[in-house]
């Protein structure tokens, strides 16, 4: 699927806040959206090639802030770290908030695309990692900026306040709370409506999926540290092997969903990282598991 086709289904419906009498105005928001698609595609590719890790989205935030200021938005940077808030006031009316993520993931891109990410950085633990936009946040940002352009260019068709939020550190589940603690809902306009989207491959290009009721899940991140007793790999009877315990724990965790949760209730438990040991003939003192848990109820 081409970047242009993907973007065509992800630019926010720009008919938000439209008054019925304004439909005769030219150009219409949808016409503006079509005009802005080439620029959206270009921005998407630019962002895709320059991803930044969670809480380090300095250049990404600056790029979005600059574009939004150029459109006439009042922009505040460094909200909750590297977050941004952009406001466009257009008379009396509801406050509508649109939100995008800013961060990328510590994964290596192997798509072979001409605009594939080749970025490598050191993470907070000092490890060198590849970085890529593997969760669509680059596309979400391009959609947000294009929507900002459409709404700024068609002010005669709507009334109210548009509030755009660039959320940092979404992947580490810390950016939203940081922005709230920094006064997102008290320093700025309090939204009447909050809208967000997520790109996916579950629908054909050109279609937008809308779900009534609950859709996405709550995400919790857990770390389990298993303490053992190190020793030589040739004498496991003198040690307490945390790797063996970790292996048993990983398998046991999967029985929570199948045996502890009521059938029909949604839960996913995934062990995404296993860290232990430094050499193949040494039993380490500990093993660390990194988990994500997804639920729809508390």
Language-model regions, residue ranges each:
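N-terminal secretory signal peptides that target proteins for export/translocation
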Residues: 1-7
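Bacterial N-terminal signal peptides
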Residues: 9-21
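Acidic/His- and Gly-rich active-site-bordering loop/insert found
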Residues: 25-133, 138-160
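Residue-level signal for inorganic ion chemistry
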Residues: 47, 179, 291
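Short coil/turn motifs at secondary-structure junctions
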Residues: 103-105, 229, 296-297
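Histidine/acidic-residue-rich, glycine-tolerant segments that coordinate divalent metal ions
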Residues: 120-132, 138-139, 151-285
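A conserved active-site cap/scaffold subdomain adjacent to cofactor or substrate pockets
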Residues: 280-298
